[in-house]
From Swiss-Prot:
It comes from the Eukaryota. Pfam families: F-box, Kelch_FKB95. Residues 34-74 form the F-box domain. The keyword Membrane does not apply. This is F-box/kelch-repeat protein At4g14905. The keyword Disulfide bond does not apply.
Length: 372
């Protein structure tokens, strides 16, 4: 349109050409926002395994797939998924790499699962770090860098793989027992004893660490594992198990569990599961105080053992990731069956399949379930 024609249009409508151009640009911007809102609403209903393929369609789709809005929408419409994150350390280079267990796009069976790398995952100290998950977030506590213990605490948002830091702990730590209980972050042990802050707690509202308990008159051996159940932190040593109850503010020794659990275990609905013997799993009901051995689950693969396997609660199922050979990782899932509360516990083998092959020997350091 020529300048004279635009002036004629402006004189007829009573509006300047510049104003009409601004209104047109504003309409286009509003339309783009509306299109984004519609796209986010649609994509939020699509399983995450298709997101990499959708991201390849165009730059705008790639931007939307990485936006926090799509995960907010997934939460609102209750389409979140329970995703497994696995930390794998190379025995040759000692580097830590992160993977997620995803379905192959257009896969139709359980064997379509695979571990895919997460190159954007923030770096984590090389040794002794405690890693836990809650909702869509992963907490990274302490560790050892260049032979020195650190007191740093970071929080990774697994929706965007971005990281923020909490204030440093009072004590540097490695291999600490950690639990999120009643909206507070408790950290137990892992520091040089004796310490006035052997147990400390982070108050998210005040954003401060407080010393809770010193280590007095308690003979604790080296920590091998820990878990949180019934708002208590269970610390597993080589020969002992101590339970820290934040409400009572003290430790109590659990003699029964101390004889059973030392390396790898996983709590699901007040029941603790762990490796018992080669290719056997023991379920221990903490409420009833009784254990059940899953003898010879049909289809259970050879090679399950605590020194190479990691257990995790995967949406109420028991997922086990383990080394089947020096370079292969397999995943097994077991459905937990129980007639009623306090009743007999049994396990049903669902499937086992190969999910990753690496070129070098490795250690499965950690397995976490994250909701996104």
């Amino acid at each position: 349109m020529s300048r004279s024609a635009a002036s004629s249009v402006g004189s007829i409508t009573g509006e300047s050409p510049q104003k009409k151009l601004l209104q047109s640009a504003s309409s286009s911007s509003s339309l783009a926002i509306l299109h984004d809102e519609i796209a986010v609403s649609c994509f939020a209903r699509v399983p995450r395994c298709y997101y990499p393929a959708i991201s390849l369609v165009c730059r705008n789709f790639r931007r939307l797939m990485a936006s926090p809005e799509i995960y907010i929408e997934r939460s609102v419409i209750r389409r979140t998924e329970n995703i497994l994150y696995v930390a794998i350390r190379s025995e040759a280079t000692k580097t830590l790499s992160w993977y997620t267990l995803n379905l192959k796009p257009f896969g139709t069976t359980e064997i379509s699962h695979r571990l895919v790398p997460v190159p954007s995952f923030p770096s984590i100290p090389g040794y002794g770090t405690t890693i836990i998950s809650s909702g869509s977030e992963t907490y990274v506590i302490g560790g050892c860098i260049d032979g020195e213990l650190v007191s740093t605490v970071s929080v990774i948002d697994c929706r965007s793989h971005t990281c923020r830091f909490l204030p440093n702990m009072k004590e540097p730590r490695k291999c600490a027992a950690v639990g999120l209980i009643d909206g507070k972050l408790y950290v137990v042990g892992g520091c040089n004893a004796p310490s006035l802050s052997w147990v400390e707690v982070f108050n998210f509202k005040k954003r401060t660490w407080e010393s809770v308990l010193s280590l007095d008159n308690v003979d604790m051996d080296e920590q091998m594992n820990f878990f949180v159940m019934n708002d208590k932190i269970y610390r597993i040593g080589q020969n002992t198990m101590f339970v820290y109850d934040p409400k009572k503010g003290r430790f109590e020794e659990d003699l029964a569990l101390g004889r059973l659990w030392f390396n790898e275990s996983c709590p699901i609905d007040n029941v603790l599961y762990g490796f018992y013997c080669m290719n056997q799993i023991l379920a221990y009901d903490l409420v009833v105080g009784m254990g059940t051995v899953f003898w010879g689950l049909e289809g259970l693969p050879e090679g399950l053992q605590s020194c190479t396997g990691r257990m995790v609660n995967h949406g109420g199922r028991l997922a086990i990731l383990f080394k089947k050979s020096p370079t292969e990782i397999w995943r097994t899932e077991i459905a937990i069956e129980r007639a009623e509360e306090g009743g007999y516990i049994s396990g049903k083998f669902l499937w086992s399949n190969h999910v990753l092959t690496l070129t070098d020997s490795f250690i499965i350091e950690r397995a976490l379930a994250v909701t996104v």
